[in-house]
Curated annotation (Swiss-Prot):
Mg(2+) binds at residues 47, 181. The gene is GNAI1. It comes from Homo sapiens (Human). GO terms for molecular function: adenylate cyclase inhibitor activity; adenylate cyclase regulator activity; D2 dopamine receptor binding; G protein activity; G protein-coupled receptor binding; G protein-coupled serotonin receptor binding; G-protein beta/gamma-subunit complex binding; GDP binding. Residues 324-329 are annotated as: G5 motif. The keyword Transcription does not apply. Keywords: ADP-ribosylation, Cell cycle, Cell division, Cell membrane, Cytoplasm, Cytoskeleton, Disease variant, Epilepsy, GTP-binding, Host-virus interaction, Hydrolase, Intellectual disability, Lipoprotein, Magnesium, Membrane, Metal-binding, Mitosis, Myristate, Nucleotide-binding, Nucleus, Palmitate, Transducer, Transport. The lineage of its organism: Eukaryota, Metazoa, Chordata, Craniata, Vertebrata. A lipid is attached at residue 2 (N-myristoyl glycine). This is Guanine nucleotide-binding protein G(i) subunit alpha-1. It holds the Pfam family G-alpha. It is linked to Neurodevelopmental disorder with hypotonia, impaired speech, and behavioral abnormalities: An autosomal dominant disorder characterized by global developmental delay, impaired intellectual development, delayed or absent speech, hypotonia, behavioral abnormalities, and epilepsy that ranges from self-limiting to intractable. More variable features include non-specific dysmorphic facial features, distal skeletal anomalies, and brain imaging abnormalities. Residues 173-181 are annotated as: G2 motif. Residues 265-272 are annotated as: G4 motif. The modification ADP-ribosylcysteine is found at residue 351.
């Protein structure tokens, strides 16, 4: 008889080898697939991070795609100046030049009649005159007392360019656009031989119940916090300080039993706005017990500690914190490179190779 295998046995061995090979390949493929969940309160910069991934890893926005953002740029610009004018009434701030009151009335008429994606020379002129007014500027400087888009000054200062008839938004203009995210936006890209799937989840509280089914098997959570929110209240709740809301949400995510083995990456975002704001608005508005100086370094480090201290499993769970400016492509590229290295290291650990 000897040890020769029958044709049937040989086929079984081949089948077994093939199954092993497929399992190995599936395992390697799974190890290369990274699911990232972007979480954070509303307007913390999640969608801007997603846009940066497209710019950094997918050759950015085509001219055609940029053109599609023209209507959003105009809408954001008009809504910003309207928000400031409305706030002037509430805050009892007068126009520096009384002639601007006519421009304000004209603004509401022209904005109401404006065709989507177009800005007439007349409307642009009205907005420009209003924006230059000392009373409007005084109201803008008190924007923490009402809801105003972060991109307001960016667009209003550049009105000459964006009001041109042949205007096409730049990548930076697109990054600065603000559209409330509803539902879940999924983005795919490849970087350092890893296949990323990034999920951007609607930040406002009414949207949070939609997150839950995204959570299973995520590699890491990127949690965005707007540092500059320390002196603001929520859009959905005029009583709740935005930073406190962020901390509450971070606590519930960081210490959630589902995420015991999930890497948590904390993006303390809008560091550029925070650096400007901390010179004028003390940190004690948010943290009355804070006794440090109102310098960027000391105040930012204090906020970092406030979030990291919420981690109840410090011995087994590490929080990877980065200070970011989501509208700065170079900064996001640098930070995301570091984040990817952490993910690779943790993946190797999970496979027993590190």
């Amino acid at each position: 008889m000897g040890c020769t295998l029958s044709a049937e046995d040989k086929a079984a061995v081949e089948r077994s080898k093939m199954i092993d090979r497929n399992l190995r390949e599936d395992g390697e493929k799974a190890a290369r697939e990274v699911k990232l969940l972007l979480l954070g309160a509303g307007e913390s910069g999640k969608s801007t991070i997603v846009k940066q991934m497209k710019i950094i890893h997918e050759a950015g926005y085509s001219e055609e795609e940029c053109k599609q953002y023209k209507a959003v740029v105009y809408s954001n610009t008009i809504q910003s100046i309207i928000a400031i004018i409305r706030a002037m009434g509430r805050l009892k701030i007068d126009f520096g030049d009384s002639a601007r009151a006519d421009d304000a009335r004209q603004l509401f008429v022209l904005a109401g009649a404006a065709e989507e994606g177009f800005m007439t020379a007349e409307l642009a002129g009205v907005i420009k005159r209003l924006w230059k007014d000392s009373g409007v500027q005084a109201c803008f400087n008190r924007s923490r007392e009402y809801q105003l888009n972060d991109s307001a000054a960016y667009y209003l200062n550049d009105l000459d360019r964006i009001a041109q008839p042949n205007y096409i938004p730049t990548q930076q203009d697109v990054l600065r656009t603000r559209v409330k995210t509803t539902g879940i936006v999924e983005t795919h890209f490849t970087f350092k031989d890893l296949h990323f799937k990034m999920f951007d989840v609607g930040g406002q509280r009414s949207e949070r119940k939609k997150w839950i089914h995204c959570f299973e098997g995520v590699t890491a959570i990127i949690f965005c916090v707007a540092l500059s929110d320390y002196d603001l209240v929520l859009a959905e709740d005029e009583e709740m300080n935005r930073m406190h809301e962020s901390m509450k949400l971070f606590d519930s995510i960081c210490n959630n039993k589902w995420f015991t083995d999930t890497s948590i990456i904390l993006f303390l975002n809008k560091k550029d706005l925070f650096e400007e704001k901390i010179k004028k608005s003390p940190l004690t508005i948010c943290y009355p017990e804070y006794a440090g100086s109102n310098t960027y370094e000391e105040a930012a480090a204090y906020i970092q500690c406030q979030f990291e201290d919420l981690n109840k499993r410090k011995d087994t769970k590490e929080i990877y914190t980065h200070f970011t400016c989501a509208t700065d492509t170079k900064n996001v590229q640098f930070v995301f490179d570091a984040v990817t290295d952490v993910i690779i290291k943790n993946n190797l650990k999970d496979c027993g190779l590190f």
